[in-house]
Structures are given as C-alpha cells and as structure tokens.
C-alpha cells in the first residue's frame, strides 16, 4: 500500500522527492496546490476504494507523504 501511495504522490507532484523525504511538506515546497489536493483525494478514492470529500480532511492532516500514507492506511482499515 505504501508503494501505491508513493507512486500516486510522485505522479501528482511530478517529483520523486516524495519518495526520498517522507516528511517534506507538499504545499510549502510547491509540489501540491489546492487543485492537486482535490485531485489526490479523487485518485485515492479510485485506487483505494474510499471516498473523502475535501471538507472531511484538512490539508494539514495530509501535508506530507508520511501523513498521506497514515491517512490511507487508516481509511482502508475502516472499510
């Protein structure tokens, strides 16, 4: 699952730094803007089978690759 998350982030951010630094802030580093954030939520639904409305999660909750992976694990476990 972690590999799938990292692949998704690498594709969305168009940068492999997301694999190298799991604590990089995706927004602060200019890797993911607000549109990218929404696209990430849509792609997570497609890949992992859970839906998340943009109002259900704040950017700060999933602002690094490590936090995105933790969020996905939590949501998949709840299915």
Swiss-Prot record:
Q: Which family does it belong to?
A: Belongs to the DltC family.
GO CC, alphabetical: cytoplasm
Kindly give the Gene3D superfamilies that the UniProt entry links to this protein. Answer: ACP-like
Summarize the PTM comment.
4'-phosphopantetheine is transferred from CoA to a specific serine of apo-DCP.
Location(s) in or outside the cell = Cytoplasm
Specify whether Cell wall biogenesis/degradation is a keyword of the entry.
yes
> What biological function has been recorded for the protein in this entry?
Carrier protein involved in the D-alanylation of lipoteichoic acid (LTA). The loading of thioester-linked D-alanine onto DltC is catalyzed by D-alanine--D-alanyl carrier protein ligase DltA. The DltC-carried D-alanyl group is further transferred to cell membrane phosphatidylglycerol (PG) by forming an ester bond, probably catalyzed by DltD. D-alanylation of LTA plays an important role in modulating the properties of the cell wall in Gram-positive bacteria, influencing the net charge of the cell wall.
Q: In which pathway does it act?
A: Cell wall biogenesis; lipoteichoic acid biosynthesis
| Protein name, as recorded | D-alanyl carrier protein
Q: Which organism is it from?
A: Abiotrophia defectiva (Streptococcus defectivus)
């Amino acid at each position: 699952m972690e590999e799938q998350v990292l692949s998704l982030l690498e594709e969305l951010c168009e940068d492999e730094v997301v694999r190298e630094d799991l604590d990089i802030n995706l927004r602060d580093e200019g890797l993911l803007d607000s549109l990218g954030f929404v696209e990430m939520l849509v792609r997570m639904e497609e890949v992992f089978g859970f839906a998340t409305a943009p109002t259900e999660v704040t950017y700060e909750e999933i602002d690094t690759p490590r936090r995105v992976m933790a969020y996905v694990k939590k949501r998949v476990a709840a299915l």
